[in-house]
Amino acid sequence: MKFLYGTILIAFFLTVMIATHSEARCPPCFTTNPNMEADCRKCCGGRGYCASYQCICPGG
């Protein structure tokens, strides 16, 4: 039974990770680039923002 729960947990984790990364398709945000916030916004059609190292595109 633990194997089944482990398999379901791994499948869920991978699904979330794939959905998160394929949704944005924008480069990661780095603090060394002063224009990163603008680049993220441009990549997301004017609505993106940097959250930690990740560029987030709200609204799909």
From Swiss-Prot:
Family matches, as InterPro entries: Scorpion_toxin-like_sf, Scorpion_toxinS_Cl_inh
Disulfide bonds: C26-C43, C29-C50, C40-C55, C44-C57
GO MF term set: chloride channel regulator activity; potassium channel regulator activity; toxin activity
Subcellular location field: Secreted
UniProt propeptide residues: 60
This protein's UniProt keywords: Chloride channel impairing toxin, Disulfide bond, Ion channel impairing toxin, Knottin, Neurotoxin, Potassium channel impairing toxin, Secreted, Signal, Toxin, Voltage-gated chloride channel impairing toxin, Voltage-gated potassium channel impairing toxin
Signal peptide: 1-24
Keyword DNA-binding: no
Pfam families: Toxin_5
Cellular component terms (Gene Ontology): extracellular region
Keyword Signal assigned: yes
Tissue expression summary: Expressed by the venom gland.
Function: Toxin with unknown function in healthy organisms. On glioma cells, interacts with chloride channels (probably ClC-3/CLCN3) and MMP2 at the surface of glioma cells. This complex is then internalized via caveolae, thus inhibiting the chloride channels necessary for cell shrinkage and tumor propagation. Has been shown to weakly inhibit Kv1.1/KCNA1, Kv1.2/KCNA2 and Kv1.3/KCNA3 voltage-gated potassium channels. In vivo, induces contraction, severe paralysis and death in insect larva of Helicoverpa armigera.
Family that this chain belongs to: Belongs to the short scorpion toxin superfamily. Chloride channel inhibitor family.
Record remark on domains: The presence of a 'disulfide through disulfide knot' structurally defines this protein as a knottin.
Protein name: Neurotoxin BtITx3
Organism encoding this protein: Hottentotta tamulus (Eastern Indian scorpion)
